[in-house]
């Protein structure tokens, strides 16, 4: 099992292999502070939170940052009397750091995805501006994605696709085609 965190900020995708250390601090970089998972958005606190392995199980601890953290579309809250409250992390968990009360993926926030499967292959970025529908081909399997929200993830047998609006990230031998759709209900897909 390769626990890893995929982090996307301002079009940049980074992967952190969490099993390489026990604690990973999340925060905004400054002259005096370099967290393990550095972020640049001003909505991120210097000491925003941390991922920590406790007895083989991964947890996220939010340090009660000003602009908060969203996990799976729910704002994380502090524990009793403002204490840090560990939240067990599961494969497929989506985090939005610095988004306030809303889980909005935007240039002011940082998106992250926790997974236990690691691909030792390069990611490809595809220009997806203007596309409202996608066809993802993984061997004989076809998956349709219509009107996705930024931060949508499709995991396939041989790879995965992350839709972020203007850019879509692809890993593995998948073929991804985009369509702008039409008013008559037909679709013309273009391969990127």
Region locations from a protein language model:
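C-terminal boundary/linker segments immediately following FHA domains
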Residues: 2-9, 14, 26, 57-59, ...
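Buried hydrophobic-core signal for structured, non-transmembrane domains
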Residues: 49-51, 128
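Short coil-to-beta-strand transition motifs
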Residues: 41-46
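Short Pro/Gly-enriched beta-strand edge/turn motifs at strand-loop
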Residues: 26-34
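Glycine- and aspartate-rich repeat motifs characteristic of hemolysin/RTX-like Ca2+-binding segments
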Residues: 23
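Beta-sheet-dominated interaction scaffolds and their linkers
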Residues: 36-40
């Amino acid at each position: 099992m390769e626990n890893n965190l995929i982090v996307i900020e301002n079009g940049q995708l980074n992967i952190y292999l969490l099993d390489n250390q026990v604690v990973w601090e999340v925060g905004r970089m400054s002259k005096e502070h370099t967290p393990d998972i550095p972020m640049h958005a001003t909505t991120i606190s210097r000491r925003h939170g941390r991922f920590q392995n406790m007895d083989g199980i991964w947890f996220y601890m939010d340090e009660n940052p000003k602009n908060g953290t969203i996990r799976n579309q729910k704002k994380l809250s502090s524990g009793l009397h403002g204490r840090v409250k560990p939240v067990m992390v599961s494969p497929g968990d989506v985090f939005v750091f610095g988004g306030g009360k809303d889980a909005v993926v935007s240039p002011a926030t940082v998106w992250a995805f926790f997974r236990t499967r690691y691909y030792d292959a390069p990611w490809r970025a595809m220009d997806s501006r203007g596309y409202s529908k996608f066809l993802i081909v993984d061997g004989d399997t076809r998956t349709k994605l219509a009107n996705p929200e930024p931060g949508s993830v499709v995991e396939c047998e041989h790879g995965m696709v992350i839709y972020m609006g203007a850019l879509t990230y692809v890993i593995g031998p998948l073929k991804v085609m985009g369509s702008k759709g039409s008013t008559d209900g037909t679709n013309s897909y273009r391969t990127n």
